[in-house]
Regions:
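Hydrophobic core
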Residues: 9, 13-17
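Beta/coil-rich, acidic/histidine-enriched accessory regions frequently appended to metallopeptidases
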Residues: 348, 352, 356, 363-412, ...
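Catalytic cores of extracellular degradative/oxidative enzymes
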Residues: 541-737
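Beta-strand-enriched, solvent-exposed domains that form extended recognition/catalytic surfaces
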Residues: 394-528
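Activation corresponds to long, low-complexity, non-globular regions
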Residues: 289, 296-403, 552, 556-570, ...
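Helical hinge/lid and interdomain linker segments adjacent to catalytic or ligand-binding clefts
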Residues: 81-95, 107-116, 130-132, 145, ...
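Active-site-proximal alpha-helical
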Residues: 305-331, 337, 341, 562, ...
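Short, surface-exposed beta-strand/loop micro-motifs that present aromatic residues
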Residues: 133-144, 551-554, 773
Length: 816
């Protein structure tokens, strides 16, 4: 439900330069002016010895004793000519040193995870994936004479106060990579981390020059600092000679940003962190990873067998016809698939092992609803992600149709005739995807022509509407995990085919200069049913849906575009009304969230046969399942008018939600202020009538009474039994009943004011609801939010206490 929102709410801390999705050759870094390093002396930190209680782990979280055929006593690996031989005993001793005095670590945001792909790399602290598998949230590696360690989130060493035993973990990590050498840790262009590490007892020196950094025994730098092969080789040489390297990487965060802003989001090809980490024996995955206990990431949770690539390969070799035990099978399949997906293609032993798996006879399985590819099919999963990366690495060629294209997005009807010389006018004032009304059939070549004057604008052509990569998000695949591609329009003529096909879009990135009008010509694609508000009528739509036999169709308004199977939209009779409805909904959301005007791109909704999660989620595009109940509410006038359309209005709300007034527990709550606002303003359906029993006075009062009887636990506000977000939504529904929509309109506008005092954490977000409303209405709102068990701070309480008590007893109904 909150794929994009989590980017706003998670404190996504990426080191300067670490975000490097670069489809073209990177610009050379300007040489920094040499300055004396700023040394920050550490605060003294007592090295506490904590008695580590052995937390009972689940079966899948406990390392079992492998047979001798699976666990070698000593193994070697080579990367770029550097051989590193490490024994299991040395790795065990290293992990013991790193977690000495540490029972758990914790930080803000959702950290990413890693897979160790070489025997010289090892997991330090485990996290738990959504499916019960385990991978490192902190990983480390021996490399030549040196050492490296990577954390799954930069906020581990950027945020204070420290949570759990994070300070001790950081001190241990720096000591381990320094190997007893004297000298400060060089912190390269990462000022916030320097101060925080000093508070953890580490002596640091801030530097702006890499040569200066390499003069220290150890350095902290974002992987983006090494964005050329030459810089990376410098780093590898430095570590191999005995240097220490510490960094962070968030594969899932980078991927989400890249999908939304560059279009090039393949970990193995576009993520610079992989090019830094993989030669060290580690790859970053595209999954955020969860805690292993209430305190955070527990060091007492051991890694299960199969959590690293060498062990997973050994197990796969031991069971060539399939792994019999389910937990082990799931762990090994996850490790092999995610490692193959993230590993940059090279001539290493690890990549050769992936290629060998992909050539196994069982690898030929094609995902479809009839032949789903499950965790047991790890040979096929590895083949599919390798083929995907091979395609995306060389998209401008004629690729044959993939057999799974018939499942999604579907194939053109036989006998359809391709177009030639269709002109598309693209105005760069409108960002993101421009619909062409053309469909590329899987395996059929299309040619795109742009004028020479447009080559410097950064335009792209995209084939395919869905942006859901299900590689690691779904245990079972019924379609290929990635079916869309983006190609830079850096030549006047390019001919290519997509293995999967899909709608053709011309993409205007946010970096493209505005004020340009470009004529693009397309050959070889097929016309599809495409309604465009202001150009077409209900009558022309009826003719198009009857004439053009593409598997997908689009209806496009001024603010939003809906992409659905043609078979679904064939019943649509009034696209003029439907597009206006969604345009108006977008305008209302923009107004409520207090943006200065319409967005410079159109929102999108796409129906897919398999999503990353659930049946609906937000993002660009918003995604819904082709069989989701209520989909007709997206495009059927009578259904919308009679019942509203909660689902997509909810997801559209996520796209306009403001993280400044949404704290973590409220992510699925405040979004529905938008849902109710649009339902009321557009359809005249009042909040209490908007969603049956879930919003009725009777239903809400029952939930409140039950919650009060349980002692009003704040942990259940927004996520308790039998209420989902609807108990928490009552907090805001009562405010709307008492003060009208004006309360939210005025309140949200305050957060957009220049120089507004914006909250920095969840405590301040909650506090500002109370203080801002108290100042707006000159009444003490702290009482109200505390009646809902919000932990309002004493400082905020003091501000609110300047005003008289609220006297509206309906606000406090059943609460006291």
């Amino acid at each position: 439900m909150k794929r994009l929102l989590v980017l706003i709410l998670a404190v996504l801390t990426i080191a300067e330069g670490a975000f490097a999705a670069k489809p073209s050759r990177p610009a050379k870094e300007k040489p920094a002016k040499a300055t004396a390093p700023k040394v920050i002396r550490p605060k003294k930190i007592e090295r506490k010895k904590i008695e580590r209680k052995k937390t009972p782990a689940t079966k899948s979280a406990r390392r079992t004793s492998p047979s001798k055929t699976v666990q070698p006593s000593k193994r070697a690996t080579a990367h770029k000519g550097v051989e590193t031989t490490v024994s299991p005993e040395e790795i065990k001793a290293a992990r013991t040193e790193l977690i000495d005095g540490v029972s758990a670590i914790r930080t803000e945001g959702l950290p990413g995870s890693f897979i160790c792909v070489a025997p010289s790399a090892f997991g330090v602290v485990a996290g738990r994936n959504w499916d019960g598998t385990y991978h490192p949230v902190v990983a480390a590696a021996f490399y030549g004479k040196g050492r490296a360690i990577v954390f799954g989130h930069g906020s581990f060493f950027e945020t204070q106060p420290f949570q759990a035993d994070t300070a001790q973990m950081l001190a241990n990590a720096v000591a381990w990579i320094e190997q007893g050498k004297k000298g400060p840790l060089a912190v390269y262009r990462w000022g916030g981390a320097a101060k925080v590490l000093a508070a953890a007892g580490v002596e640091v020196a801030e530097v702006n020059d890499l040569d200066e950094a390499f003069a220290s025994p150890a350095l902290l730098a974002g992987a983006g600092a090494f964005d050329t092969p030459e810089k990376r080789q410098q780093l590898f040489d430095y570590i191999a000679k005995g240097g220490g390297y510490m960094t962070s990487s968030i594969g899932w965060g980078w991927k989400n940003i890249a999908q939304n802003y560059t279009g090039f989001s393949c970990l193995a090809l576009d993520f610079v962190d992989e090019k830094v980490l993989a030669p060290l024996g580690i790859v970053a995955t595209d999954l955020g990873i969860g805690h292993t206990g209430d305190e955070g990431y527990l060091t007492s949770v051991d890694f299960p067998l199969g959590a690293d690539l060498p062990a997973a390969l050994s197990i796969a070799e031991k069971y060539p016809d399939g792994i019999p035990e389910e937990t082990l099978r799931k762990q090994v399949s996850k490790t092999l698939t995610m490692a193959a997906d993230a590993y940059p293609p090279d001539d290493s032993a690890a990549y050769a092992a992936f290629l060998e798996l992909a050539q196994h006879p069982l690898a030929a399985k094609v995902p479809s609803p009839e032949t789903p590819v499950t965790a047991a099919d790890f040979y096929a999963r590895v083949r599919i992600v390798l083929e995907k990366n091979r395609w995306l690495a060389d998209p401008v060629r004629v690729w044959p149709a993939d057999p799974s294209a018939a499942t999604y997005p579907g194939l053109m009807a036989k006998g359809a005739k391709p177009v030639k010389g269709v002109e598309i006018q693209v105005e760069t004032d409108e960002r993101r995807w421009h619909s062409t009304g053309l469909f590329a059939n899987a395996g059929d070549p299309i040619t795109v022509h742009v004028p020479e004057s447009a080559l410097g604008l950064g335009l792209q052509v995209r084939v395919g509407t869905t942006d859901d990569d299900i590689s690691s998000a779904q245990a079972t695949w019924i379609r290929s995990p990635v079916v869309s591609e983006t190609i830079a329009l850096n030549k006047t003529t390019q001919t290519f085919s997509s293995p999967f096909g899909g709608f053709v879009y011309i993409v205007v990135p946010f970096s493209t200069p505005k004020g340009n009008v470009v004529q693009v010509k397309v050959d070889g694609a097929y016309r599809a049913p495409h309604f465009k508000r202001g150009r077409d009528t209900n009558k022309t739509w009826a003719k198009a849906i009857e004439t053009y036999h593409a598997p997908q169709a689009e209806i496009e308004g001024y603010r939003m575009v809906i992409t659905f199977p043609s078979s679904s939209l064939s019943s649509l009779t009034d696209p003029e009304w439907v597009t206006k409805f969604w345009d108006d909904a977008n305008d209302l959301d923009v107004s409520l969230t207090a943006l200065p005007g319409p967005l410079d791109f159109k929102q999108r909704v796409c129906a897919d046969t398999q999503l990353t999660a659930g049946f609906l989620h937000n993002g660009y595009p918003m995604m819904c399942h082709v069989s989701a109940d209520g989909n007709s509410g997206l495009y059927d006038k009578e259904t919308i008018q009679a019942h509203g359309v909660w689902g997509v209005l909810h997801e559209l709300g996520h796209n306009h939600q403001n993280g400044a007034w949404t704290f973590g527990k409220a992510a699925e709550v405040t979004v529905n202020i938008f849902t109710l606002y649009c339902t009321d303003k557009l359809l005249g359906i009042k909040p209490r009538d908007a969603f049956g029993e879930w919003m009725s006075v009777e239903g809400c009062d029952r939930r409140v009474s039950d919650w009060v009887a349980r002692g009003k636990p704040f942990d259940e506000w927004g996520a308790g039994p039998d209420n989902g977000p609807f108990l928490a939504l009552e907090t805001f529904t009562r405010l709307q009943e008492a003060y009208g929509w004006e309360l939210f309109e005025k309140l949200f506008a305050q957060y957009r004011q220049p120089g507004a005092d914006l909250p920095k954490n969840d405590q301040e977000r909650m506090d500002q609801w109370a203080t801002r409303l108290s100042e707006m209405y000159e009444a003490d709102f702290a009482d109200y939010f505390e009646a809902w068990s919000w932990p309002i701070s004493s400082e905020a309480r003091e501000i609110c206490a300047k005003y008289p008590k609220l006297e509206n007893e309906q606000l406090f109904r059943l609460l006291r």
